[in-house]
Curated annotation (Swiss-Prot):
Catalysed conversion reaction: D-glucose 6-phosphate = 1D-myo-inositol 3-phosphate
Assembly: Homotetramer.
Task of the protein: Key enzyme in myo-inositol biosynthesis pathway that catalyzes the conversion of glucose 6-phosphate to 1-myo-inositol 1-phosphate in a NAD-dependent manner. Rate-limiting enzyme in the synthesis of all inositol-containing compounds.
Gene3D superfamilies cross-referenced by the UniProt entry: NAD(P)-binding Rossmann-like Domain
Any one GO molecular function term: inositol-3-phosphate synthase activity
Similarity comment: family membership: Belongs to the myo-inositol 1-phosphate synthase family.
Primary enzyme class: isomerase
GO biological process, one term: phospholipid biosynthetic process
Ribosomal protein listed as a keyword: no
Reported phenotype of the disruption mutant: Inositol auxotrophy. Virulence is not affected in a mouse model of disseminated infection. Simultaneous disruption of ITR1 results in lethality.
Protein name as catalogued: Inositol-3-phosphate synthase
Subcellular location: Cytoplasm
Taxonomic source organism: Candida albicans (strain SC5314 / ATCC MYA-2876) (Yeast)
Length: 520
């Protein structure tokens, strides 16, 4: 149990299970005059926040629940909920949520009154957040294998743990899902035996609106059956090929709905799930790299004020890249090339062995350094070169299973023609890195739905903007509000989360000035 916290702030007050906070948002607006000089003007705007402190009963529906990530999440939540330990060659392993920011990391809340040293508390102790042990989990999968056997097929969790989990999962089958063969690799057809758009063994893609309505019914039934307050849907299924963004097809919300009703060939399964979620006003998170959120989906989410987040879990190689590239550029060192190679043997790798699906992943992984490069015109400009040579290779190697091997080489330019190479060899258990991200995305998304804000000149509170860029820390290619570029630097992404928590409880944002150490 963590130490209880009382926030004594003149900016916040608790009333009727809600936390009310006042905050002055300070920034600097920059203009460039006719002579090319920057004019910097400090700004300040007053905001009021309202946070619902009651943690609801939350259900999680996973698209792809029978895959490696889905079964690993089920195993993790069950092991933690029932305190299931197991023994391996290194000794007894107790259940935990290592790798989860919300469950296994801490944040600074201030300095000790006596010593002046930093004081840290668990991330999830600042404000009430849902406990992953309490999640009600179900989902869809194109494979009808019962979830205990799907866990065995995944080969992620230790066998001695699996055997203790089987009683909770045996005979539990995924909900029937959608299968549009054109969007995932043909090698996945052998798994597709649990699809509702199949008649007499033939897959039908000529009534996609009926597919939307079926998913909506599944959501409503799940919520009613389990007496849930909220439901969150997360895609952890196969990577799809990119959908073409076409005029009059998926470029606006109205055109998108019309195209679904016409069963247009560029309407992907993930988009069907997203639209169904939005129409039910249920948050939808895309954990794969495909472009589920075509412009029409984003506009639909804005119209219904329904949360969407994506794209693509940022777990291993890309997470390191978003830190290391930022470090090099901030240090005044110029990365010239980044070569990234992966091989893995799970079903994700099998699906990505198809060129169209690999292309989705390649686009997702390449974009992670874009804003970092653009932040430094001293290093990257037309004269000396404004690009980084960046290549991505992913190979399927069945023997290594879920243990993904990632090798990176960063080739950088130093002063006076010098060069530097940093080579990284990273072996990680892919699903054991990705599953904590799912937990964080769900916990953070649910919390964000309980935050309301009243901006300058507004008389009523409103929900946060539906494109949830707050989730960027956990995503390779984070969605950004239209008109804004994504932020990819990992430290910036985490600082945004921590700063928001501080603001909501009336604490000052941690500015790291540390006057008590540097002033006389």
């Amino acid at each position: 149990m963590s130490t209880p916290i009382e926030f004594k702030s003149s900016n916040s007050v608790t009333k009727d299970d809600h936390l009310y906070t006042k905050f002055t948002y300070e920034n600097s607006v920059v203009e460039k005059d006719a002579n090319g000089k920057f004019i910097v003007t400090p700004t300040a705007s007053d905001y009021e926040f309202k946070v619902d402190l009651k943690v609801p009963k939350v259900g999680l529906l996973l698209v792809g629940i029978g895959g490696n990530n889905g079964t690993t999440l089920l195993g993790a939540t069950l092991a933690n909920k029932h305190n299931i330990s197991f023994e391996n060659k290194e000794g007894v392993v107790k259940p935990n949520y290592y790798g989860s920011v919300t469950q296994a990391s801490t944040v600074k809340i201030g300095v000790d009154k006596e010593t002046g040293e930093d004081v840290y508390v668990p991330f999830n102790s600042i404000v009430p957040m849902v406990n992953p042990n309490d999640l009600v989990v179900d989902g869809w999968d194109i494979s009808g294998l019962p979830l205990d056997q799907a866990m065995k097929r995944a080969k992620v969790l230790d066998v001695t743990l699996q055997k203790q989990l089987y009683p909770y999962l045996e005979n539990k089958k995924p909900l029937e899902s959608i299968y549009y063969p054109d969007f995932i690799a043909l090698n996945q057809s052998e798994r597709a035996n649990n699809v509702f758009n199949q008649v007499n063994g033939e897959v039908k893609t000529d009534n996609k609106w009926a597919d939307v309505e079926k998913i909506r019914k599944d959501i409503r039934d799940f919520k009613a059956k389990n007496e849930l307050d909220k439901v969150i849907i997360l895609w952890t299924a196969n990577t799809e090929r990119y959908a073409d963004v076409l005029p009059n097809v998926n470029d606006t919300a109205d055109n998108l709905i019309k195209s679904i009703k016409e069963s247009h060939e560029e309407i992907a399964p993930s988009t069907v799930f997203a639209v169904a979620s939005i129409l039910e006003k249920v948050p939808y998170i895309n954990g794969s790299p495909q472009n589920t959120f075509v412009p029409g989906v984003i506009e639909l989410a804005e119209k219904y004020d329904s949360f969407i987040g994506g794209d693509d879990f940022k777990s291993g190689q890309t997470k390191i890249k978003s830190v290391l590239a930022q470090f090099l550029v901030d240090a005044g060192i110029k990365p010239l090339s980044i070569a990234s190679y992966n091989h893995l043997g799970n079903n994700d790798g099998y699906n990505l062995s198809s060129p169209k699906q690999f292309r989705s992943k390649e686009i997702s992984k390449q974009s992670v350094v874009d804003d970092i490069i653009e932040s430094n015109e001293l290093l990257y400009n037309k004269e000396s070169g404004d690009k980084v040579d960046h290549c991505i290779v992913i190979k399927y190697l069945p023997a290594v299973g879920d243990s993904k091997v990632a090798m990176d080489e960063y080739y950088s330019e130093l002063m006076l023609g010098g060069h530097n190479k940093i080579s990284i060899h990273n072996v990680c258990e892919d699903s054991l890195l990705a599953t904590p991200l799912i937990i964080d995305l769900v916990v953070a998304t649910e919390f964000a739905t309980r935050v309301q804000v009243k901006g300058p000149g507004k008389s009523d509170y409103d929900e946060l903007y539906p494109v949830a860029s707050l989730l960027s820390y956990w995503l390779k290619a984070p969605l950004a509000r239209p008109g804004f570029k994504p932020i990819n630097g990992l430290n910036k992404q985490r600082q945004q989360l921590v700063n928001l928590l501080s603001v909501l409880v009336g604490l000052p944002i941690d500015n790291e000035l540390r006057f008590e150490r540097i002033l006389k």
